[in-house]
A protein has these predicted regions:
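Binding-site signature for planar aromatic cofactors or substrates
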Residues: 1-212
Length: 212
């Protein structure tokens, strides 16, 4: 399989310092709204990269479910591979690959778990089947087959029929507090625009242009 000839020149837009919002969260919201307006499939899908304490990396796609001045929120099973790694190494990276817009956003920071009340509020906003699924899925564990999941789902549906489904003790939210947020815009001849917000010592943000 030859991939050498797969290439595209990026021509849709540029990114100049004068066009940036002063706050990176506002800039992210602007780009996110443009991704929604362009009808990108699941614009809140992001790659989450974690690493074990000995430096072994892993990555997977998760969904952004909250954003404010404190950071970027997603939800998961605390006993999954990602959960085990985050418990030992809180440093993470997120990537939003908005390829159709020739854009991506790279976020690096530190993760903490969100308050139990916040996790419960989100959990109970989910479809009932998704709530049950959070109980069924022993994420990242080896199972004998799909029938194991389907049988467990039926048993839980019967157990909780007509009742509220409680929040699993091993499930909840994480918040990524960013230290850097880079906005990447593809440009002609691979001379891409890369503008990075970086936390300064006073807690504000510095903006730096990076070489492509």
């Amino acid at each position: 399989m030859s991939l050498a000839d797969l290439r595209k020149d990026y021509t849709l837009a540029g990114l100049a310092e004068k066009d940036l919002a002063r706050d990176p969260f506002r800039q992210f919201e602007k780009w996110f709204q443009e991704a929604e307006a362009a009808k990108l499939a699941e614009p809140n899908a992001m790659t989450l990269a974690t690493a074990s304490p000995d430096g072994r990396p892993s990555a997977r796609t998760v969904l952004l479910k909250g954003l404010d001045g404190r950071g970027f929120v997603f939800y998961s099973n605390y006993e999954s591979r990602k959960g085990r790694e985050l418990a030992l190494n809180a440093r993470v990276a997120l990537v939003f690959p908005w390829i159709a817009l020739e854009r991506q956003v790279l976020i690096e920071g530190t993760v903490t778990t969100v308050a139990r009340e916040e996790s419960a509020a989100y959990f109970h906003s989910r479809p009932r089947a998704s709530q049950l699924g959070a109980w069924v899925a022993q994420q990242s564990s080896v199972i004998p087959g799909r029938a194991t999941l389907e049988e467990a789902m039926k048993a839980l549906e019967k157990k909780h029929a007509g009742a509220e489904i409680p929040l699993p003790p091993n499930w909840g939210g994480y918040r990524v507090a960013p230290e850097t947020i880079e906005f990447w815009q593809g440009r002609r001849s691979r001379l891409h625009d890369r503008l990075r917000y970086r936390r300064d010592k006073e807690g504000g943000w510095l903006v730096e242009r990076l070489s492509p």
